[in-house]
């Protein structure tokens, strides 16, 4: 006999919202931070061992794939930090209570989520601009 029971809740009723994006990105950036820590560990081990190991590590980090991975790792770190601070504020009850219970339909409520994504991107670009200026000899 076929199962005729309804599926509940069905995925078709959900609308993609910024908090779903934040939750997914928070988990993915946490995973990427763990994987990126392997790259940092490789660098520490290479620095503590021979000069050849360090030159291999530096060559990898200077390649286009190394730079992309380091850029994404930086963004992951800063997004995870910003989103974690937002979680902390929500855990402390900031903007929760009877006066704010219907804010889920408020555009300002949702724009705060997009602000976290934007702030993390701006901070990442700022870090890399400062880093490239420092490496390039533009800063004293």
Predicted regions and their residues:
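Membrane-embedded alpha-helical bundles that constitute the cytochrome b-like, heme-associated redox core
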Residues: 1-140
């Amino acid at each position: 006999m076929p199962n005729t029971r309804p599926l509940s809740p069905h995925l078709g009723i959900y609308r993609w919202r910024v908090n779903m994006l934040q939750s997914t990105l928070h988990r993915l950036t946490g995973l990427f931070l763990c994987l990126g820590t392997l790259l940092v560990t490789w660098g520490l081990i290479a620095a503590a061992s021979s000069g050849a190991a360090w030159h291999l590590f530096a060559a990898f980090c200077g390649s286009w794939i190394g730079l992309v991975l380091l850029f994404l790792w930086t963004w992951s770190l800063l997004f995870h930090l910003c989103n974690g601070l937002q979680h902390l504020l929500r855990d402390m009850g900031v903007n929760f209570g009877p006066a704010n219970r219907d804010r889920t339909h408020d555009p300002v409520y949702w724009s705060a989520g997009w602000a976290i994504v934007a702030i993390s991107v701006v901070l990442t670009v700022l870090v890399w601009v400062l880093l490239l200026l420092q490496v390039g000899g533009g800063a004293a």
